[in-house]
Amino acid sequence: MELKEFAIKILEMFECNEPKEFPRKVKEALFSATPSKYLDGYVNICDDLSVDHLQRIYQFYNADRAEKKQDYTPPSLAKLVAYLSYSAGQKVVYDCCAGSGALTIQKWVTDNNLTFVCEELDEQVIPILLFNLSVRNIEAIVLRKNILSQEIYEVYELHKGERYSKIQQVLYESPVAPDVAISNPPFSLKYAVKKNDIRYLEIVPPASNTNFAFVLNALSLCDKAVFILPTGVLTSKNEKGCRQKLLEKGWLKTVITLPGRMFESTSVTTCILVFDKQKRSKDVMIVDASNISTPIIREQRGEGDASHFYRVYKKEFNALSDVQIASIIELTEKESHNVSMLVPYEKAAEHDFNLSPGLYKELEFNENIIHRGYNEIVEDINRVIRERNVIKLTVNKVWANTLNLTEIAKMNKESNEIVRQINKALKQLGLKCEILNNKYINISTDKELRIENTDKEILSSLLLIFMPMYRQHVYFLNNEENRLLAELRDAMLPDLLSGKLTFEDTNN
């Protein structure tokens, strides 16, 4: 069922006049005299309980990317985490930053008898989490909690019933020792941990982000944990100390880099880190799964008046098939040439504890390949950039969100940073050729949109038809540019290996 159509049915069932009422109405339904009316209604609309369907509705209407860094876990990624976190005899699972429960649901699919401890700070998403647990008849404790400061605001207990879990709000948490932790925490929040916090006495995460703060919190509760994190945790300078200490202790078992474009609301690339405090060696298995994926198309109706509501737009993402999930699991157990590498602690130390897979692959350089000259490649790149720059779009920030252009603007900025680095490298080689900057989009704070909108208060409906074509044109040219940049990269490789070229380290 298409998202908008599904959302309308769910919102009508909860008697929501507008989407922002959704969390409140769900909570009212759960604590009403007849919660089974709504639970039955949900099952009638969607009888597949193996997927967190409510997640997509909440994310579309209510998720907070800017402040809380909320991006909810794709189902196939949650399924991979469920299998990676398996061990015999598990009874209790801790879901750190549980969100709407996507990870918990996939873990529950593997074993319906598991008990869950779910911690989540966002008051708005707690009702969605409770509904997801109850409709699946899951035994759980749910805490609305600031995991970093350890402040607890609300506690709920869910006990299995005949068909649905019964929910009860309680005053105090009943401590339960988890066997494993699973988590997709908010990425790179800023938070300075307290000096006397026993979770961080041996390993102190940086104040600039909380990625490893969440990890260390989980490892203070149980010996095994599986985390989805941004790939920056593998290379950033300010998190080097955490990587080093975790490797010294032998707690980091596996690193898996994932394909891009798996999340709906962010282009940040991600990885999975598997921890095991019972592991006896300091070696770490590094798996490059960035090229293992299956493209999927998600359909969604347009926003705005009827002419756009009845138009279905398509967006492509990457997902993992069951076969690909099984392949990744297998790669974590054995080495495969340049895909999964068992890296000794000493080798990681040689690379300053940078855990990017590329550092540990064997270089394969074919001297028989003859590349075109730099000038010729750069000329082709500039041809693509010039064509893309012919139309410059200046658009108000609010309208950019409405038209799904914020990702395009981010790509423009990221591309210019790559161009800056390559131009610096070309100068090192004594070449005069230079790649042009991208100038095809500008996000403005003024109420303006140029290609050109005459009314500054009203957004022309024509643009809602035009923009999907514009985005596809940019994506096409981005792919063409990436192909040529890859050719330029390969041409530079001999000069890079010989030391004639150096690139600055831009990691924080």
Across the structure, where does each feature detected by a protein language model lie?
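Alpha-helix N-cap/helix-initiation motif
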Residues: Q70, C118, I203-A207, V474
